[in-house]
Amino acid sequence: MPRYKLTIEYDGAPFCGWQLQPTLPSVQGALEAAALATCGEAVRVHGAGRTDAGVHALGQVAHVDIPKPFRADKLRDALNAHVRPHPIAVLSAELVADDFEARFSAIRRHYRYRIVNRRSNLALELGKVWRVPKPLDTDAMHRAAQVLIGKHDFTTFRDTECQAASPAKTLDVLDVVRNGDAVDIITNARSYLHSQVRSMVGSLVWVGEGRWTADDLAAALAARRRSACGPVAPPDGLYLVQVDY
């Protein structure tokens, strides 16, 4: 069967996450229903990143085997028609080789965590960012973030229910950038542990608020103990931006 690579954007708020759940709305489930309506057969849509409940995507990638050939733009348009009214958009569809795997062929995943650093409530971006009212020292956050760059045992920063065989991951980039009230935490790596990005973000916010220093963050990493982690940032501000192959 022809295999297609899909690039997908979605608002994660209404979903239990990417992964199919029998009784809860999921991004994967909505796309598989759209694919069924498109080609008349049940198919599995495989995602590059299994985003958690409430996490958004600007450039999630998936692959799907369709029983009959489609022109790529026609497949994109059909999936978009059938996925409505869910807040999901198939940005592109591309015919790929049979051995392409959205998850296992990926060499890098890019995430951005968006914070609005102000006391005033959110009006336009509610559910899309994390509002942190206390002033953040973003220079201190960025300096501390460099402690986490490289290959480490990230046990402290992974969910206790994480099923990864090893807690070792290699973090290539972790930058903290301010533009007015907007604070972006930008990271990329080949892969991440469950809740790793949100755990790192919450701990960096403690640094920004002055509760922790860079040394405290380093000690938390070295502890290799989940209880040593700072707070886990809410899912609202997290975006899967891009997947590289």
Swiss-Prot record:
CDD domains the UniProt entry points to: PseudoU_synth_EcTruA (cd02570)
Catalytic activity: uridine(38/39/40) in tRNA = pseudouridine(38/39/40) in tRNA
Residues reported in the UniProt entry to bind substrate: Y111
Active site: D52 (nucleophile)
A GO molecular-function descriptor: tRNA pseudouridine(38-40) synthase activity
Record's keyword annotation contains Isomerase: yes
Domain of life assignment: Bacteria
NCBIfam families: hisT_truA
Protein name: tRNA pseudouridine synthase A
Organism: Rhodopseudomonas palustris (strain HaA2)
Gene expressing this chain: truA
